Structures are given as structure tokens and as C-alpha cells.
Amino acid sequence: MASRGGLFSEHMLRYWDGVKLTGIDPWKAFSFSGEHEPKDFVPQQTHDEFYKESQHRLAQFGQRSHLIRNTSRAASEQFEESSLDFAFIDAQHHFDAVLEDLNIWFPKLRPGGVLAGHDWGLYYGPPLFGVEKAVREFSKNHAIQNIHVTSDQWTWFFHVPD
């Protein structure tokens, strides 16, 4: 989830021998309330440029790459439960959004699959980033024994229990 300009998807497709990678992103500016614009706010024109960049960057992979321009929740309806081997979450980073994505995509993964994401240790002001808190809470509620975090504190993952 959250393909932005397609860099991570390109890397995955280049070095991973999987059958198909689906990038999901609404490529749409999100609304915010309050007096301060969040530091991660991106205007719609930039989202449109990211979408075109993703299409161009991933075209070389043909049928192995598929983009869905929609929200995570709406796109998830296209996937059956226990049908995915891997899901990577790097969308909105506030607690509620991360928890929602975890709840949406966890059932879509097969037992033994990997649920992963980005920006574990990132915090740079409003809105409060809640990646770590959401992943820890979700893991506790779903009997996930081990959360693995890279040494740079950016990427996290866990295996779906059998």
C-alpha cells in the first residue's frame, strides 16, 4: 500500500522472482484538520505526477506489475482471504490509519505469509506518527510472537501464524 512514485515496487520486481506485484495507492491528497499542515502533506498535482511516474517506471515489468488507484480498503475487496504471500504497508502513518491497514490486510495473507511496513521509528511532528504503536497493539491482539525491525528502525515485519 502506498506506491508513491514506484521506486520500492521497481526494486521488488527487479530482485524478487514472484509472479505478480500489485501497487495500491489512491494518489490523492488527503484532507486534514487543524491549523497546521502536516509535514507529510502532498498536493494533488504531485500525486498525479507520482502516479504517472509509477506507470512509466513499472511498465517494463509487463504483467508482473499491476497498479490500483484506490484506497487500501476499496482495493482490498479485490483479494480473497489467505491469498497473498506478502503485503507491505507504507501509507498514512497515524495510529488509526496504520491499525486499519493492518486489520484489512492481515486476513488477506496466507499462514506463513509476511506482513511488513515502513517508517517504524519515524516521528517528525503533527500528526503524531503511530506506526510502532499500531503494530505493537495489533501484534499483541493477534498473538504475533515476534516483530522484526531493521537496525536502522525503518522497516518492520512479522510472519502470519500458521
Predicted regions and their residues:
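S-adenosylmethionine/decaboxylated-SAM
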Residues: 1-162
